[in-house]
Amino acid sequence: MTTLFRIESDRLCLRCGQAGLDESRPLTAADESRFRGWLQDYHNPSRGYGNEPARLRLGRELYAWLDGDAGWLARSRATAPAPWIVDFRGPRDPDGLTRLFLQLPWELLADDRGHLAADLALRYT
């Protein structure tokens, strides 16, 4: 099963057929600022690449933002067989906000137990 996150205009859309999810929420100037801060942290050697506690914190912040008030990730994971495939997409000619979204280090997604990519049962890809 694939969980698809895509940017359409000024909205983040989620589609996960198996979980019955087809929802969207607006993207705001605050989201753009948040994306810039996360990318800056990720590319800062003292706070990103080589600093595992900082990478874990960033992964948890990304998870919390993507999950949102509606619990998108939790609801998708609840029905996901392994491997849990998550796809991030934007339009063919992305604007600045979409580029930032697509550049985020989604491989770092983490919950309270750690990085999702390290969960052998989930097999997040």
Enumerate the language-model features and the residues they cover.
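Non-catalytic, solvent-exposed interaction/assembly segments
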Residues: 1-125
